[in-house]
Amino acid sequence: MIAPFAFAAERSLGRRYPEPPHPYRNDFQRDRDRIIHCRAFRRLEDKTQVFTTRYSDHFRNRLTHTIEVAQIARTAGGALGLNTDLCEALALAHDIGHPPFGHSGEKCLDELMRGFGDGFDHNLHALHIVENFEQRYAGFPGLNLTFEVREGIIKHSRDYAAGEAPELSEYLLEKKPPLEAQLIDFVDEIAYNTADLDDGYEAGLLEVAEIRRHVPLFDRMYATAESAWPAALPKLKFNEALKRVLDSLATDLVGHSARTLEQDKIESVEDVRNHPRRLVSFSPPMAEDCATLKRFLYAHLYEHPVLVADREQGSRMLTGLFAIYMSRPECLPPSYRTRAEHEPLHWVVCDYIAGMTDGFLQRQFQELAGLNHKDPKNTKFTKQ
């Protein structure tokens, strides 16, 4: 049983293209399955989270991060009485629009597109993927996901001001998203903050003493772990502390959100949608702990010279490949050249690059940067 304020599958506003019901899967379960089986989801395996895959096979990538978000979302969503199928579908789709090379790749694409008076947003790109770019079905373009999953994709980590983005007006921009979508924003934060600590420590870029000195939440959890396992190896003490950090964040999120729902007398999906603010959140003390952790990661991990150098190299390749395609559109695959006949070239190039994996972009750049003496008609293209 789900709570009255959870979004039941039978209440869905449906799909853009009507389909008959499935005999044993509800609509949100079908959405989950379609996301898992689409090409864009598989490409997340070779998209950077923080560390590029050249460092270790054990560091997170966009795919493993997404799986971790989905796992936490199902658990936290179930504890709150939410629809765990919708939670899972939204979690699996939340990063599907990210370009190669992590957030630096998104920033780079955004800056390139602003040169044409536009911009790049990975949520909007994700919506385009599931509505148009994925081609798996004979009866419709895209994945034909339910309204609620598409709404959750476009509202991930942001609200819209009145009159903003009129092209997205069908997605009830003036209303708050369902609780399941609100939950994903915080679960995403829990997953990447704890995972980045883990990967940073594993890479030797972060030391336990340094983390304890700057992150009170970790310091408290490490002291507890050290008391429980005084003879354990340092790595195992770190693991125990990090496990407790994750559990503390998730437990606080569930507990504080449940209290908010009770205090604000939230009894229906309509109450959620019409509420002036989002209802899922950390408690104020935990929000401050989380903010402190994020500040530490930015100062001591994300700005580490090793990672800065990686980001700069990725941005140079992305910028260079963008310029090549803009000056030589004949280098684009046939389907994108066809689009360029009736769409602005910079958007076609942006969409193509945004869908690439780290490795594919690097290979394309290395091949095409020396194209002066090649005939583009003889260039072999790999679908992305």
Task: Please tell me what each predicted stretch does.
Residues M1-L63, A70-A76, T84, G105, ...:
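Histidine-centered, transition-metal-coordinating active-site segments
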Residues C87-L92, D185:
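Short alpha-helical catalytic segment bearing the HExxH-like zincin motif
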